[in-house]
Design a protein with these regions (language model features):
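Bacterial N-terminal signal peptides that target proteins for export
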Residues: 1-7
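Bacterial N-terminal signal peptides
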Residues: 8-17
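A charged, well-structured terminal subsegment
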Residues: 171-199
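Short, conserved loop/helix-junction motifs that constitute active-site signature segments
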Residues: 111, 136-142, 166-167
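Solvent-exposed loop/turn segments at secondary-structure junctions
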Residues: 42-45, 77-81, 122-126, 151-156, ...
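N-terminal beta1-alpha1-beta2 submodule of the flavodoxin-like/Rossmannoid cofactor-binding fold
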Residues: 19-115, 125, 132, 189-199
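Short, glycine-/small-residue-rich phosphate/pyrophosphate-handling segment
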Residues: 146-182
């Protein structure tokens, strides 16, 4: 290797490091193991999009399931069925204040999955309490956990923090958020995000 090649390689390394801003970048690698998408989604009366038959988060979860070739488990509770938006907000706030853990239907065996996408709407700054019920029952420590959210201005809120608190030994990374009113035209955005994770 001549001196010009060495200098060129050194400059390339310097530029790539500068672009990272000195922050260690953590990339989620698809190891061809099966992934699981776990989510809670609320249909019915929703902020910004009105009364919808399919919840915003379910639409995103379906995109991920299709594009990543993943399996899917929906956290289903009927506690919020038929509720208008404002009463639901009030109930969600009260559940959060009390630390309630509403029950949900069914169960899932996560032992065969290395990667779990976990998503929901952002209610009062974090995931709905029924998702914390899932966190309390299902151990995802040792796995790669990828949070995603739908929202109307909260972004990821405290969801990533709360997933890390629930699973301190998981690799919580690769998070994604999207406005609820954008999800119906958001498949390309989800696909672009998944490509950054090698899916």
């Amino acid at each position: 290797m001549n001196i010009r090649s060495i200098i060129t390689a050194a400059l390339a390394l310097l530029v790539s490091t500068a672009c990272l801003g000195g922050v260690k970048q953590q990339k989620v690698m698809n190891n061809n193991g099966k992934a699981l998408v776990v989510f809670f989604s609320h249909a019915g009366d929703n902020y910004s999009v009105g009364n919808i038959k399919v919840g915003n988060t379910k639409i995103v979860a379906d995109y991920i399931t299709e594009l990543a070739g993943a399996d899917q488990f929906e956290i289903v509770t009927h506690k919020y069925d038929g509720m208008a938006y404002q009463p639901l907000c009030d109930l969600a706030k009260e559940e959060q204040r009390k630390g309630e853990l509403p029950p949900y239907e069914g169960s899932v065996d996560v032992s065969k999955y290395d990667t779990v996408f976990i998503g929901g709407p952002v209610w009062w700054g974090t995931y709905p309490q029924v998702m914390f019920t899932f966190f309390s029952k299902v151990d995802l420590n040792g796995k790669t956990v990828i949070p995603f959210t739908t929202h109307e201005g909260s972004g990821l809120g405290l969801c990533v923090r709360d997933v890390r608190k629930a699973y301190p030994k998981a690799n919580v990374t690769g998070q994604f958020s999207i406005y609820g009113h954008d999800v119906r035209d958001g498949k390309a955005r989800v696909e672009k995000w998944l490509k950054t994770l090698d899916y």
